[in-house]
Amino acid sequence: DEIGISVGDEYEGKKVSKNGCPSEGTVDIFIEPHTPPPQLVIYGKAPVAEALKKLAPQFGWEVKFANEDVEPSISSKLVVMVVATQGNNDLKSLSAAIKLKPTFVSFVGSKRKFTSLKAKLANSGFAETDIGKVKAPAGLDIGAVTPEEISLSILAELLQVRKNFRNGAYDESS
């Protein structure tokens, strides 16, 4: 009756009748936003990289591979990069990852190795603030030894980053 139509009238070729539903004609609509999955970009083909590639999709990560010459396409607000080059173009891969300004960058390697790379990155013109955002060694300290264990420790750290990012509590310094 709000638009001048009553029960029994015809409207757009249909006969109008009273709705017998207890809702009296109201409809509840549930909207679930669909956001792109977080992206994990892996530099390198080391055993840890391969293990991470297999494990990460099980936890909702879209996995992409990149190298110092191939820039990955970014389609998510949350992008993390893991450099697992194992001595193969470490500096070039770290440089490429840092330039893309992802949410998080981690380096699979020792603190000593990363210390030498930090000096080279600084000499290449990278700001200390950008270099300081790289987490090295990658992963949580769980005493991991095998590539699978190391990839699990990295993934646990990435899940922590993802949860904090979604809750608005992500802090690049942590």
Show which residues each predicted segment covers:
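Adenosine-phosphate binding glycine-rich loop
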Residues: 108-112, 116-174
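Rossmann-like adenosine-cofactor binding region
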Residues: 74-107, 112-116
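Segments forming oxygen-rich coordination pockets for charged ligands
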Residues: 1-80, 113, 119-122, 157-174
